Amino acid sequence: EIALPGKRHLISDLEIRGEDTFRQSCGKDAHLLLLPNHSTHSDPEVMSEVTRRLGIRPSFMAAYDVFARGRVQAWIMQRTGAFSVDREGSDRKSMKCATNVLVEGRYPLIVFPEGNVYFCNDQVAPFAEGSSYIAMSAQKKLGMNNPVYVVPVSMKFTYLEDVRDHLRSSIRKIARRFETELDAEAEFGRELSRISTTAVSYTHLRAH
């Protein structure tokens, strides 16, 4: 059973594809760098569940502001293999720590290369430079006889029921706040773009 119940994540099921290929390609003692996309705030918990099912214990690189959200959360994260990184600057200490984790090979290293949550299921944002730097630094230390395996991980979330009516209801309320209406006959994506533009213009005019 999935270990992500509750109102925070709202995830009822998890399907893993490519497990056999992953195990055959990487082996037990491989130096693994897992690079998942970052489409929701539940991604770290999902990756924890995935690695639990695969029987591996990972180490996470996480943004420092996640640790600042609370002492209890920071305490738990540190004791489950997570360490912080400053996304805004050159965090040499974190880069060194990540490289060492990869070189030692005791735990797979998980890095979200997009660097932030983008709420895009089917589109990946440009990667930050950190993940490639970590991989190449580790490979340089290990030498060519001990390869670093960089494993892309694609997470896709789907609704179990049709949520379009709920979404239209929410957008209709937002549209009215900015003195416009949702056109039910128009293509929804274009309407969403139009209402977003209207909201920005409305806010800009009210600010002046």
What are these model-predicted stretches?
Residues 1-48, 71-74, 78-82:
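Membrane-anchoring hydrophobic helices of lipid-metabolizing enzymes
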Residues 5-19, 44, 52-59, 95-96, ...:
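Basic/hydrophobic alpha-helical interface regions
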Residues 45-52, 135-138:
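Histidine-anchored nucleotide/phosphate-binding helix
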Residues 60-64:
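Short internal beta-strands
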Residues 90-93:
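Glycine-rich anion/phosphate-binding loops
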Residues 103-164, 191, 195:
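Membrane-associated lipid acylation/remodeling enzymes share a hydrophobic transmembrane-juxtamembrane segment
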Residues 173-184:
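Acidic, His- and aromatic-enriched active-site or binding-groove loops in soluble protein domains
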Residues 203-208:
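Conserved small/polar residues in nucleotide/adenosyl-binding loops
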